[in-house]
Amino acid sequence: MIDVIVLGAAAGGGFPQWNSAAPGCVAARTRQGAKARTQASLAVSADGKRWFILNASPDLRQQIIDTPALHHQGSLRGTPIQGVVLTCGEIDAITGLLTLREREPFTLMGSDSTLQQLADNPIFGALDPEIVPRVPLILDEATSLMNKDGIPSGLLLTAFAVPGKAPLYAEAAGSRPDETLGLSITDGCKTMLFIPGCAQITSEIVERVAAADLVFFDGTLWRDDEMIRAGLSPKSGQRMGHVSVNDAGGPVECFTTCEKPRKVLIHINNSNPILFEDSPERKDVERAGWTVAEDGMTFRLDTP
C-alpha cells in the first residue's frame, strides 16, 4: 500500500501569492472560483503512520498543522515524519527544512548537487547532521526508505535525473545532471512518480509514466509565455526550467497514450488558468484525463 497526501499543490509563491493582485490570486483570496493552495509538497507512507515528505516547502509548518496524519501523539515531542526527500535545491523545495530544526531526528535525502547547495549555506547547519543525517541519492538505484528506528518502511525509492536547471541562486556555478530529480516510489506492487519540475519530456520519462500507477507531474504553466503575456514576469517557462501543460511537448500531448496511471498536475503557478475551477483550460485537462491537485487531496495505491 502507498498512501499519498498532497500537502501543497502550488508553485513557488503559493496561490494566492502574497504580493499579487492578478486575477487568479484575487479569486483565491476572495474564494471566488479558485481554491487557495500552499507550495508543492507530498507526504507518502506505506502504513498510514510513518511518513516521508517529498520537498520541504516554505509552507511546511502550516501544512503539518493542517494534516492530522502528521501530528505527533504520545510523548512531549516527536513526529511521524521519518525523512525528507528533495527533488532539487530550489527555494520552494528546501525552505521548509528550517521549520524542522527543533532537534528532531529524521533523514534528509537529495542529490549530491542539492546536498552540496545546502552545505554551502550555513543557515542549514541549524539541522545538525548528527541528528539529521544527509543521505545522497544514487541516480537510478533503488534504495529502501528507512524508518527512524532502522526498520524498512516498506517503500523503495529510485531517483532519476530529469531535464532541468540549477536553482536561481546557484546558476553561476552551472547546471549538473542531478540538479533536478524525479522520484519513483514503490511498495513492490504499485508505483507512484513525483516529477514537480521538468524542462523537457524525454522518451525515458514517457516510459516511466506509462508504467506507473499514479503520477504527479509539473503543471507550472499552461503556456510557455503566459507570465510574459500577463505582465507578471519577463521569464518564460523554459527559462524557469518547466515544460508547459498545453504546449507542444507538454504533458497533455506527451502522455496521451499513458492510460494506466492516474495523472495529477502539481506545482501549479498562480498564473495558470487551470486553477480556475470553471475555466476552459481546466475542462480541457480534465477531459484529457488529468486531475488538478489541491491541498489535502489523498490517494491510496492498494496492494492486491
Swiss-Prot record:
UniProt keyword Transport, yes or no: yes
Name of encoding gene: pqqB
UniProt family annotation: Belongs to the PqqB family.
Organism: Gluconobacter oxydans (strain 621H) (Gluconobacter suboxydans)
Name of the featured protein: Coenzyme PQQ synthesis protein B
Xref: InterPro entries: Metallo-B-lactamas, PQQ_synth_PqqB, RibonucZ/Hydroxyglut_hydro
Keyword Transport on entry: yes
Function: May be involved in the transport of PQQ or its precursor to the periplasm.
Pathway(s) served: Cofactor biosynthesis; pyrroloquinoline quinone biosynthesis
Pfam families membership: Lactamase_B_2 (PF12706)
Origin superkingdom: Bacteria
GO biological process: pyrroloquinoline quinone biosynthetic process
Record's keyword terms, sorted: PQQ biosynthesis, Transport
